[in-house]
Amino acid sequence: MEYSMNKISIVIAGPAYREFDIYYSIKLLRTHFPESEIILSSNDHLLLTHANRLGVFDKIVTVENSGELPSLKFESVSDRGQPIVCNNINKQIKTSLHGILEASHDLVLKIRTDQILMQNHIISLWNLIKDIPNDNKKTKGRIITSSIFSINPRFSERMPYHISDMLQFGFKEDLIRYYSAPEYPFDYSVWYETHIYASHSNRNENIFRSRYAVEQWLTMNYIFGVNTPFPIKYHNDISHKIIKDFEYIFPDFFIIAHPKDISLRASKFNSAMNYVNNQCYST
């Protein structure tokens, strides 16, 4: 079955983004994904008020603010004087899941408020990959995601199962499974305040405060299930076997697309694109 632009639900999740008004995101999405259902899911009351006033969304989902955890990493020298970025994993899970649950169509695009698709190329990619066979019996299909921070653990940050969480495109039931990860525990968020780093840790890895990266928590719960032990015990738990097993299994669950291949504008991460192009998986 070939999918078209008018058979999808688009879920935009997150707080207001300062670079541009969300009105322009919706206008562009309506152009390139005509007749699609567009849903806003947020706990940002100022954004919700603004969205209701605009009247451009098909549905608006108000989500309770579950609060933030301590920052994912300890402050480094280069971070001094910069605003502290807290760990928003539980807010992300809740806003994304509640929005996806409201989707009316079987095919769903979930995107952040600070990103936008400039064309509809993701539909062409989906129609290209949707029938590729795999050994995965847990999900209905694969999820298309971005190469932005889909980290290859052979390089400077050796974190397997670190698949980007910034964008998902796939079947509704698969996105529900992805965002049905359990609440991230507080003791995991401050893990390295009381635990010693692995002896092989490098400078990029030993600034982590959290036991796992957000992306690892979502990816491993999605692939292995909520009640199954993870194949890694901490963020940079690494071996040749772990990498081999990871690279064997993840293509059955994800297609990792370079932003250019899906016309993804993610200006917030422009400064990281050299890293993304050299150290992340990609189409």
Predicted features along the sequence, with ranges:
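N-proximal low-complexity "stem/linker" segments adjacent to membrane-targeting elements
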Residues: 1-21
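Short loop->beta transition adjacent to catalytic acidic/histidine clusters or analogous donor-positioning motifs
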Residues: 6-8, 30-40, 58
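Soluble or luminal CAZymes and related metallo-dependent hydrolases
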Residues: 14-21, 87-95, 210-214
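Short, well-formed alpha-helical segments that are part of the catalytic scaffolds
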Residues: 17-32
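Active-site-proximal specificity loops/subdomain of glycosyltransferases
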Residues: 41-102
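Active-site acidic Asp-centered loop
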Residues: 111-112
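Catalytic core and acceptor-binding pocket of nucleotide-sugar-dependent glycosyltransferases
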Residues: 117-124, 129-282
